[in-house]
Amino acid sequence: MRALALDVGLKRIGVALCVDKKIALPLDAVLRKNRNQAANEIKNLLKIHEISLLIVGIPKGGSREEEMTRRIKHFVSLLEFDKEICFVDESGTSKEALGYGVANTRKKDGKLDSLSAFIMIKDYFAL
């Protein structure tokens, strides 16, 4: 069983992979030029890694929660993923990712976003 976690943002999408509910690792983030380009890159990952579960972070709380949730769910619909999709609370994952000390917050390369996705998948499977 393979799962992919997404931390969907307006400029970058953090991505993490979990294999057999045992091994999880962050992947390179997808840098968004537009929705269709980003959706196609994620579709490719779903196919290449033979994903059976998609875990997607949704913000809980905050003034823009409703708008971001709508945007994220619209993006997920573009993936045309016909297997299980689970939306999870992503609150605090970026702050926790900063604690790993790996991501350079000045660089906008998506490492922090993928670490956030990694934390979501780690928490989902209690790894």
Curated annotation (Swiss-Prot):
Arranged from A to Z, the UniProt key words for this protein are: Cytoplasm, Hydrolase, Nuclease, Ribosome biogenesis
Q: In UniProt terms, what function does this protein have? A: Could be a nuclease involved in processing of the 5'-end of pre-16S rRNA.
Record EC number = 3.1.-.-
Its name, as the record gives it, is Putative pre-16S rRNA nuclease
* GO MF, any single term: nuclease activity
The UniProt record lists the keyword Cytoplasm: yes
Chief subcellular site?
A: cytoplasm
Q: Organism source for this protein?
A: Campylobacter jejuni subsp. jejuni serotype O:23/36 (strain 81-176)
